[in-house]
Swiss-Prot record:
UniProt-recorded name of the protein: Beta-amyrin synthase OSC2
InterPro entries cross-referenced by the UniProt entry: SQ_cyclase_C, SQ_cyclase_N, Squalene_cyclase, Terpene_synthase_CS, Terpenoid_cyclase/PrenylTrfase
Catalyses which reaction(s): (S)-2,3-epoxysqualene = beta-amyrin
UniProt keyword annotations, A-Z: Isomerase, Repeat
Role this protein plays: Oxidosqualene cyclase catalyzing the conversion of 2,3-oxidosqualene (2,3-epoxysqualene) to beta-amyrin, a pentacyclic triterpenoid with anti-inflammatory properties.
Active site as annotated: D492
One function term, GO molecular function aspect: beta-amyrin synthase activity
PFTB repeat residues: 10-53, 104-146, 156-197, 447-491, 521-566, 598-638, 647-688, 709-750
Native species: Citrus sinensis
EC class of the enzyme, as a word: isomerase
EC numbers: 5.4.99.39
GO CC entries: lipid droplet
Stored PANTHER family: BETA-AMYRIN SYNTHASE-RELATED, TERPENE CYCLASE/MUTASE FAMILY MEMBER
């Protein structure tokens, strides 16, 4: 059976892995053929079968394998009887003791049992279907496929399971698990199947190949796909738009200097430009020759492709961001004039070789400062391949191999590659939800372990050496999205980590442990203050500074807003909440700067509000998520329904978008289309219901008219499962407008948090006691008698 291991290295024999904090937060999967009873194996198989049978209706996994493991290890048994509010009948009495609190206590008890030994909550953080295939391709090219994923191994079985389970009915694969089929992911997953031993006549391969050929073949794959297929030898580098490594030796005053790029864009094109500059191609194996035959139509086989023309081709299914004409003009100029010069003597000797070395220096720097995890999974594989191209037997490549397990995750739908783990992000919200429950006496050890994890996960130092020369910002005092070893500061992760430490510092140390030293809190404040932009908003990773017109040069076809760093509503709100709390507890530290920061940040939030009263959420789906965050920031700064027209408009949006059954349900299509789109059939989603509910609570809805809150609470209470869990529903995370991300822990964190805030706010108003609510009414009006 598969087992999740937490807080461990790869064993004493692996000298190529190291940690800054004894691997706190590290989560890796290992297969033990001797583990598990027949009953446990049967439970796993039942979970797999259930997912398979329902895969057309529910795409995200329920992340059951590690949950089964943890619940068994902790001998968990739900001892609090389940309560439900009757759906039938005219009225149903609800009291604080019998309904909301019972559901809350059951959920807290269940969720506490899922905490790992090091204090964090493990969870899947995946969903995009272009994460895993490049890893398999890289290992195939470097000759390490059988080392990492041996033939006939359980790893291969689970990878194949994942690919098969998420193939769409039309034979293709989407950009993410809920998306329509795209050329990019269909071609990559087809190649992955073939590398892993699936024959071309296998039903999954045959239907995928038909999908590809019916749309003209892989000449229409987007630019990232063209790059990977060129590396493999199934495409030609002359069919790619130029990615000159000379970019990395440009003068820093130029507007398109890489130091001004968004860090993820910079980190993707850094190794890509190295591989392009080398024109690296893997060995042309018999399989590669077969793929050349399989992926091109008979009318235009591989050897007859017009590669120059192919550079600008992109399947309509992939074209979310069509290139503007100015971008194509730049690519054509580089392709026709610049590249022919830079690849000939003496320019190839004195310019290109220098550019390649500088690029590789940056790759090594980033690898070292992330302990070879790198900033994310797309970048990880490219940097690993670049290290192998430079030195196939070098330590850098071996250190990359040692960190591959950090990215792999196993659930009932198979093995997938994570973005890079959401350990700190999930734990920060989990702790806040548990603290809001007011069940401190019941969960003291849970809070203490969580507190220790958060303290252990704070980044203690800035990047090494002259980090500004390497285009890096300060990181000391920050929190990452995953764990300390990752090393990359994130503003909202830092703000949420700071909030946790401040909240826990107000509690008895004998329950939650020693509070964090003030100096470390000051470091966190310093990071947040350093990131605010001129218009008051906060970016996620690095200061905003580049010209917005640079987005015209976005080289991807399926993402938007990826060239430069931008401000985000969620990051800004988190920072407001954290700094407001900090200023109350430490009024003597940089108070004027913090007050000025909050004033500008509130101005940014008010300006960012949409006409309908909502805010666009960049990291969750979508307007519901953004509105919850924005209202939290506004409330922390003293903005109320009474004194703020911004808050009143937001409340109007939330009440108008509440569904018939009291919840909220928003389609992921809201994100790419940038307009509110309800779930099909006006269904509700429990995570989004929690967001909408907490948004109204921030805006004082409990004091004005609690009926909408009662209706939402009824949905959450009645949806809770027998063991205290909540059901998995639609995907709720997003990045770069167009790609969805599955946060498996959200289904526990947010319903718990919403119920906790509901109980706390409404208990204060004594609304829950002795109140008879018309639960079956869909009206937002209620009378007290």
């Amino acid at each position: 059976m598969w087992k999740l291991k937490v807080g461990e290295g790869n064993g004493e024999k692996d000298a190529y892995i190291y940690s800054t904090n004894n691997y706190a937060g590290r989560q890796i999967w290992q297969f033990d053929p001797e583990a598990g009873s027949d009953e446990e194996r049967a439970q796993v198989e039942a979970a797999r079968l259930h997912f398979y049978n329902n895969r057309d209706h529910l795409k995200p996994s329920a992340d059951l394998l590690w949950r089964m493991q943890f619940l068994k290890e902790k001998k968990f048994k739900q001892t609090i009887p389940q309560v439900k509010i009757k759906v039938d009948g005219d009225e149903e009495e609800i009291t604080y003791e019998t309904a909301a609190t019972t559901a809350l206590r059951r959920g807290v008890r269940f969720f506490s049992a899922l905490q790992a030994s090091d204090g964090h909550w493990p969870a899947e953080n995946a969903g995009p279907l272009f994460f895993l295939p490049p890893l398999v391709m890289c290992l195939y090219i470097t000759g390490h496929l059988n080392t990492v994923f041996p033939a006939e191994s359980e790893h291969r079985k689970e990878i194949l399971r994942y690919i098969h389970y998420h193939q769409n009915e039309d034979g293709g694969w989407g950009l993410h698990i809920e998306g329509h089929s795209t050329m990019f992911c269909t071609a990559l997953n087809y190649i992955c199947l073939r590398i892993l031993g699936q024959p071309p006549h296998h039903i999954a391969c045959a239907t995928a190949r038909n999908w590809i050929l019916d749309r003209g073949g892989v000449t229409l794959i987007p630019s990232w796909g063209k790059t990977w297929l060129s590396i493999l030898g199934v495409f030609d580098w002359s069919g790619c738009n130029p990615m000159p490594p000379e970019f990395w030796i440009l003068p820093s005053f130029l507007p398109m200097h890489p130091g001004k790029m968004w860090c993820y864009c910079r980190m993707v094109y850094m190794p890509m430009s190295y591989l392009y500059g080398k024109r690296f191609v893997g060995a042309i194996t018999p399989l590669v020759v077969e793929l050349r035959q399989e992926l091109y139509p008979e009318a235009e086989p591989y050897h007859k492709v017009n590669w120059g023309k192919a550079r600008h081709l992109c399947a309509k299914e992939d074209a979310y961001y069509p290139h503007p004409w100015i971008q194509d003009l730049i690519w054509n100029t580089l392709y026709v004039f610049t590249e022919p010069l830079l690849t000939r003597w003496p320019f190839n000797k004195f310019i290109r070789e220098k550019a390649l070395q500088v690029t590789m220096d940056h790759i090594h720097y980033e690898d070292h400062n992330s302990r070879y995890i790198t900033i994310g999974c797309v970048e990880k594989v490219l940097c690993m391949l670049a290290c192998w191209v430079e030195h196939p037997n070098g330590d850098s490549f071996k250190k990359h191999l040692a960190r591959i397990p950090d990215y792999l995750w196993v659930a009932e739908d198979g093995m997938k590659m994570q973005s890079f783990g959401s350990q700190q992000w999930d734990t920060g919200f989990a702790i806040q939800a548990l603290l809001a429950s007011n069940l401190i006496d019941e969960i003291g050890p849970v809070l203490k372990r969580g507190h220790e994890f958060i303290k252990a996960s704070q980044v203690k130092d800035n990047p090494s050496g002259d980090f500004k020369r390497m285009y890096r910002h300060i990181s000391k005092g920050s929190w990452t999205f995953s764990d300390q070893d990752h090393g990359w500061q994130v503003s909202d992760c830092t703000a949420e980590g700071l909030k946790c430490c401040l909240l826990l510092s107000m509690m008895p140390t004998e329950i939650v442990g020693e509070k964090m030293e003030p100096e470390r809190l000051y470091d966190s404040v310093n990071i947040l203050l350093s990131l605010q932009s001129k218009i008051g908003g906060l970016p996620a990773w690095e200061p905003v500074g580049a010209h917005k017109w640079l987005e015209l040069l976005n080289p991807t076809e399926f993402f938007a807003d990826i060239v430069i760093e931008h401000e985000y509503v969620e990051c800004t709100s988190s920072a407001i909440q954290a700094l407001t709390m900090f200023s109350k507890l430490y009024p003597g530290h940089r108070k004027k700067e913090i007050d000025k920061f909050i004033g500008k940040a509130i101005g940014y939030l008010e300006d960012a509000q949409m006409a309908d009263g909502s805010w666009y959420g960049c990291w969750g789906v979508c307007f519901t998520y953004g509105t919850w965050f924005a209202l939290g920031g506004l409330a922390a700064a003293g903005k109320t329904y009474t004194n703020s027209p911004t808050v009143r408009k937001a409340v109007h949006f939330l009440l108008n978008s509440q569904t018939q059954n009291g919840g909220w349900g928003e389609s992921f299509r809201s994100c790419p289309q940038k307009k509110y789109i309800p779930l099909e059939g006006n269904r509700s989603n429990l995570v989004q219901t929690a967001w909408g509910m907490m948004g109204l609570l921030h805006a004082g809805q409990a004091e004005r008219d609690p009926a909408p809150l009662h209706r939402a609470a009824k949905l959450l209470i009645n949806s809770q499962l027998e063991d205290g869990d909540f059901p998995q529903e639609e995907i709720t995370g997003v990045f770069m407008r167009n790609c969805m991300l599955h946060y498996a822990a959200y289904r526990n964190i947010y319903p718990l948090w919403a119920l906790a805030e509901y109980c706390r706010r409404l208990k204060d108003r004594k609304i829950l006691h002795g109140f008879r609510a018309p639960w079956d009414s869909t009206s937002n009006e209620v009378n007290f008698e």
